[in-house]
Amino acid sequence: MPMADHPATPAVVLAGGLAQRMGGGDKPLREIAGRSLLARVIDRLAPQCDTLALNANGDPARFAGFGLPVIADPVDGFPGPLAGVLAGLDWIAAHRPDAEWMLSAPADCPFLPSDLVVRLHQARLDQQADIAVAASAGRSHPVIALWPCRLQIDLRRALLADDIRKVDRFTARYPRAIVEWPVQPFDPFFNANTPEDVAEAERIALRDSR
């Protein structure tokens, strides 16, 4: 499926986590090879998505340099990535009511594949799925997913009424397509959770730029 053939797809970049394994602070602003994690994620997604928004809590001014709308969790208490997905769906309903699909991706995955959106769309069509989820090395990455915007109301109910916090618990309610990517020369869904991961991301970025 050529990129122009799939529906226009906005994306929400999830940066609402507490970065506890990184010692707190704004993990998306950590630099690898002279460029922040968030900037690298934007670089990867901008050619694939027609609109980007950033889900982050706290003072939005710290992300002003990226030129993205910053949207906070609509649910109190840092309830996890599902709240960020809901924030994205709420924002799209208000600002892109024409959109039928939304991509979600975390702000700490700097090597997202260039065919992410097109392959997720193809898989959900081929498998008649409601949600398409990325995977690598036999493991799914539930926050890197293609969501139908019509799940906005269901997701709000799951968070507020059913107290569901884990992404897999919510997505298990719907037909899912799991889309596997190769991990050579590196895992495109490598995420920088710890200082050691950041060091490894530096090595990958330098190798990838040669």
Swiss-Prot record:
Transmembrane segments: none
GO terms under biological process: bis(molybdopterin guanine dinucleotide)molybdenum biosynthetic process
Protein's name in the database: Molybdenum cofactor guanylyltransferase
InterPro entries in UniProt: MobA-like_NTP_Trfase (IPR025877), Molybde_CF_guanTrfase (IPR013482), Nucleotide-diphossugar_trans (IPR029044)
CDD domains (UniProt xref): MobA
Purpose: Transfers a GMP moiety from GTP to Mo-molybdopterin (Mo-MPT) cofactor (Moco or molybdenum cofactor) to form Mo-molybdopterin guanine dinucleotide (Mo-MGD) cofactor.
UniProtKB keywords: Cytoplasm, GTP-binding, Magnesium, Metal-binding, Molybdenum cofactor biosynthesis, Nucleotide-binding, Transferase
Name of the gene this protein is made from: mobA
Reaction(s) catalysed (UniProt annotation): Mo-molybdopterin + GTP + H(+) = Mo-molybdopterin guanine dinucleotide + diphosphate
Cellular component GO terms held in the UniProt record: cytoplasm
NCBIfam families: molyb_mobA
